[in-house]
Amino acid sequence: LPCFLEKTHRFPALELVVGLLLLITSADLGINGRAIFRNIDYATPYMRMDEYVSYLDDNKPLIDDIKASDSGMYRICQNYQLTSNDPMLLGFKGMFHYSSTYTQSINALTSKLGIGQAWLWNTGYGTTPVTDSLLGVKYLLSDTAESSGYYSLKTTDNSVSVYENPSAMEFIYSAPLASADISFTSDPFENQSRYLNNLCGS
């Protein structure tokens, strides 16, 4: 570098060109860096540390209680969220998942069953007792009252309740071979009915 600077110093025009290139490159890196951070903030907004800690303090004990009382294989779903990957944040198997390595067939199925899905992101929004049971959702964390056949287990000071779904199925269950071929419609409730009927072989 000192040798290069010494050579450019002998040629003022070259020194000017190098300086301009350095300035342009620095500006380009700065503008692109700012754009990247703004787009990341748009996709997954930044939050204050106290918001993050408060969310963990409110929700992690609920998850820990569930896992301590039930060591089985099941999903936990929420009707609220902090991030696009709350199950990874809180350490449980859930419905919310954001990944660039998504499986297209899974995303297509959840969308046809009426579950909120947006390209790389699967959610638990829009589930019903039927889809919860089929997908092994045994527990629900809800900040609103649930009355669709779920048992209330616990309500916290911050009005989040834990509900249990007594009809939750296992992650893996057998079904007739014909159930692999289902003709879906544009009606998610009809699709849920067809999916369930095919699983039952009817």
Q: Where are the model-predicted features located?
A:
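P-loop NTPase catalytic cores that bind/hydrolyze ATP
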Residues: 28, 58, 73-84, 133-142
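Flexible, solvent-exposed extracytoplasmic
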Residues: 67, 97, 130-202
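Contiguous transmembrane helix-bundle modules in multi-pass membrane proteins
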Residues: 1-55
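Beta-sheet entry/capping signal
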Residues: 15-24, 73-76, 138-139, 160-162
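Membrane-proximal extracellular/periplasmic loop immediately following the first transmembrane helix
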Residues: 56-64
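Short periplasmic/luminal acceptor-recognition loop of GT-C membrane glycosyltransferases, typified by
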Residues: 63-102, 163
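Luminal/periplasmic acceptor-recognition loop/helix of membrane-associated glycosyltransferases
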Residues: 54, 95-134
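Flexible loop/turn segments at secondary-structure boundaries
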Residues: 31-34, 41, 82-88, 96, ...
